[in-house]
Amino acid sequence: MIHFSINKNLFLQALNTTKRAISSKNAIPILSTVKIDVTNEGITLIGSNGQISIENFISQKNEDAGLLITSLGSILLEASFFINVVSSLPDVTLDFKEIEQNQIVLTSGKSEITLKGKDSEQYPRIQEISASTPLILETKLLKKIINETAFAASTQESRPILTGVHFVLSQHKELKTVATDSHRLSQKKLTLEKNSDDFDVVIPSRSLREFSAVFTDDIETVEIFFANNQILFRSENISFYTRLLEGNYPDTDRLIPTDFNTTITFNVVNLRQSMERARLLSSATQNGTVKLEIKDGVVSAHVHSPEVGKVNEEIDTDQVTGEDLTISFNPTYLIDSLKALNSEKVTISFISAVRPFTLVPADTDEDFMQLITPVRTN
């Protein structure tokens, strides 16, 4: 029968992290619970939605936790309800005691709340990933890669493989990550400091975004383990499992052009602000596009909406080379791409009005390239 006391705020923080893997509307009702596992070493909180699973460990040795364990065991509690109850408790310290099979009493200050739980044996087992040699990355670096690519993945389930980000390690240290929804593409390449085993996996972009939320910047490094259809991201106290997407990712290398007819370098902030103004009106037009005109070295953006009005704006540039061009595209794609850049300047290169154009950072030597497909207009 479980019995422990703990700092309420730290416990609540750990519960909220674990809850990111828990869906209250799951087809499997037991997955709307959080599993609380108490051992001599500490407390493990477990949550899963079938796609991702999070194990969050609070160590007996963690001084901030003020953890005092009197007796061991495990129990399932309805996650959202339990977290709401814990957050409402008045005192800094929380006492958690199982009084009879799967029934607990929470005591804090003068408040005492009794809750019914469920037998932890009902909870599905998380498939263990056998201990192999992990790939070790800086957490900040992995989160940066995710920020630069995951936004370009598809949100449509019609082609499930495109809802993921393709991670490929070749020659033991050359990492390439790509995401595309077939209208836009984002690709980041880098050379790792240490050699690792090659891999080729597609990780759901939704799982990667959750990873970024769960692994805060104070976690310096993350260990990455691969198994048949799963990947595990692990730090000292958090294990984050996600299923991989099955199938072959399309060959995106052939989509990337190398020869261009027009090249422009912009200030990222200026261009983004221009596009955000243009989008205010383009969202009211039938095709939602903005027209970019390059003529005699001058670049301007145009939107015309019969219902709302029009935008004509000359955009400052640092450099314009090549042929004149008029091209239409979805401004949201360009805004998203600019948000993913960590540079002050961007170079955009065009072939023609109907061929995809590329964006690369102009003032860093990062191997980071984005591609946007234009929209054909009359």
Curated annotation (Swiss-Prot):
Domain of life where this protein originates: Bacteria
Annotated keywords: Cytoplasm, DNA replication, DNA-binding, DNA-directed DNA polymerase, Nucleotidyltransferase, Transferase
Coiled-coil boundaries: none
GO BP, sorted A to Z: DNA strand elongation involved in DNA replication
UniProt subcellular location: Cytoplasm
Subunit structure, as described in the record: Forms a ring-shaped head-to-tail homodimer around DNA which binds and tethers DNA polymerases and other proteins to the DNA. The DNA replisome complex has a single clamp-loading complex (3 tau and 1 each of delta, delta', psi and chi subunits) which binds 3 Pol III cores (1 core on the leading strand and 2 on the lagging strand) each with a beta sliding clamp dimer. Additional proteins in the replisome are other copies of gamma, psi and chi, Ssb, DNA helicase and RNA primase.
Family: Belongs to the beta sliding clamp family.
Protein name: Beta sliding clamp
Protein species of origin: Streptococcus pneumoniae serotype 4 (strain ATCC BAA-334 / TIGR4)
